[in-house]
Amino acid sequence: MSYLQSVPPHDLAAHLADHDGKSVLRFITCGSVDDGKSTLIGRLLVDAKLVFEDQLTNLGRVGSSGAVNGGEIDLALLLDGLEAEREQGITIDVAYRYFATSKRKFIVADTPGHEEYTRNMVTGASTADLAVILIDSRQGILQQTRRHSYIASLLGIRHVVLAVNKIDLVEFRQSVFDEIARDYKAFAKKLGFASIQPIPIAARFGDNVISASPNTPWYKGPALLEYLETVQLDPPATERPFRFPVQLVMRPNANFRGYAGQIASGSVSVGDPVVIAKSGQRSSVKAIVTFDGNLTTAAEGEAVTLVLADEVDASRGNMLVAPAARPFVADQFQAHVIWFDANPMLPGRSYILRTETDSVSATVTALKHQVNINSFAREAAKSLQMNEVGVCNISTQAPIVFDAYKESRATGNFVFVDRVTNATVGAGMIDFPLRRADNVHWQATDVNKGARSAMKSQRPAVLWFTGLSGSGKSTIANALDRLLHARGKHTYMLDGDNVRHGLNRDLGFTEADRVENIRRVAEVAKLMADAGLIVLVSFISPFRGERRMARELMEEGEFIEIFVDTPLEECARRDPKALYEKALAGKIANFTGVSSPYEAPESPELHLKTVEEDPVALALKIEAFLDRHREEK
């Protein structure tokens, strides 16, 4: 087995040409904590002579405080680059390494084993073709081994190397290796891997890493690197349907219009017909432009600019596709979701959903079940906690373009983003569109919002009163309702307690129920605004994310957030319904301000302080604001 050595300058062109012709294998190392993932990759790189001398010298200095066995270099330090990783002796972030042998190029992602960093493992696995799953010979299959195996399968990885590591610590016994391999294959039978290759390894000493070890004469299979060089991958994405997400419209002069991006799957040639996925507009490829000159054909992974034969309405976020094999365009679908955030995923809560081409508001309409990663059983659940996996129905505010994830990883995935923090809180793999998306259509009506509001001589608005229980929301809203009614305005007041007697009588006060409570009320308020009414919504609505969701349902300028700011002590002193007394005594659970948080508005349209003015004066302030608001319109 030969490896790349230093190349003389005069042979550089030939070397690069040879290098470009090699296939690329992307793989990850994963498994439980301290199974030796980073050490294995470090050993592979060192023994294959793919690490420079100065790197090894530097590792000796960096690792001196944590060196083992009288100064032996800790090979894991080749991958663990963060200071916290070196201090704790664990992997936290995903570490990528690029290397090549005479047969193949490799991109390896060393992923963390701690459950806390599952999100980083998902990141590494999302583009991998193969997973090297490590198991400590002394420990056997652990929960995190199962978790990583399931996630690898879920993310479309088809090939697995089962690296049974630290085989030296069980005296290289074949019986231990055979038992672990047998148990893992039985466990993984339902995961659908195309191949599983068990290999006994002692990563610290290099046994079976790049060559066969004399310590395991009973093992007749390939060494790790030999297997990585020869494993047959799935068919290339060029055989899949053509998908081209438009990233930029190139318009350097009046005579040129091109659509720039990277081909997500498939291939395209000059003259091929294409269609814009959402609009259905058709054209054909006139030219394929690159920095190095025009091409006749381009394939998956290439960054190109496509010039079309016709003038079409395409912009950033559109997708050019093959007319004979179009993706789905729908606003409802089923997906597997892996949750990353410490705050649980709640059905009814609004998130930002981002795909290759779209960024839209989305809601989990149903959590069908949670997946038990040990047994793969489907278990009922009302929410997903951090690192849990569930199957969900998802609804988006506008149709998006997608493929089933099993057909196209690039166009079948998405992430959930928190509306308040902008943190990525979950990742999803789309299974299929829901048929209801095709069967439910908007019914056009002749009388619209403009006609209804004109008849009432008023501008529709949603006045959203938020604040603690006892802050005075309903009192102020009621006073304002009287003022507006006296002026002949058409209003309606939605009060939290009143709505719970009917529409929301089935909801409690858990975080999930509060989210659904606000979602329903926001939709009702939207319908009332569409009827031309001024809607007064008086709800605690403790979460910023739900209030933002309500705002985005309305037209621009229609939603007016009113923060009724009363100190908790004052609310408890008033306690008109004796709720604080019960909450403080532990008789009411999940009570806002006592045992459940309240997220105050950061930039409300109106900020009212009830300890400074009486309800009527505050209602007059809101009335004056509405008058100015109408004039500005």
Curated annotation (Swiss-Prot):
One of its GO terms (molecular function) is sulfate adenylyltransferase (ATP) activity. Residues 459-633 are annotated as: Adenylyl-sulfate kinase. The active site is at S541. GO terms for biological process: hydrogen sulfide biosynthetic process; sulfate assimilation. It catalyses: sulfate + ATP + H(+) = adenosine 5'-phosphosulfate + diphosphate; adenosine 5'-phosphosulfate + ATP = 3'-phosphoadenylyl sulfate + ADP + H(+). Residues 165-168 are annotated as: G4. Residues 22-236 form the tr-type G domain. Residues 1-458 are annotated as: Sulfate adenylyltransferase. GTP binds at residues 31-38, 110-114, 165-168. Coiled coil: none annotated. It comes from the Bacteria. Residues 202-204 are annotated as: G5. Residues 110-113 are annotated as: G3. Sulfate-activating enzymes, NodP and NodQ, may be physically associated. PANTHER family: TRANSLATION FACTOR (PTHR23115). Proposed to provide activated sulfate for transfer to Nod factor. ATP sulfurylase may be the GTPase, regulating ATP sulfurylase activity. In the C-terminal section; belongs to the APS kinase family. In the N-terminal section; belongs to the TRAFAC class translation factor GTPase superfamily. Classic translation factor GTPase family. CysN/NodQ subfamily. This is Bifunctional enzyme NodQ. It comes from Rhizobium sp. (strain BR816). The gene is nodQ.
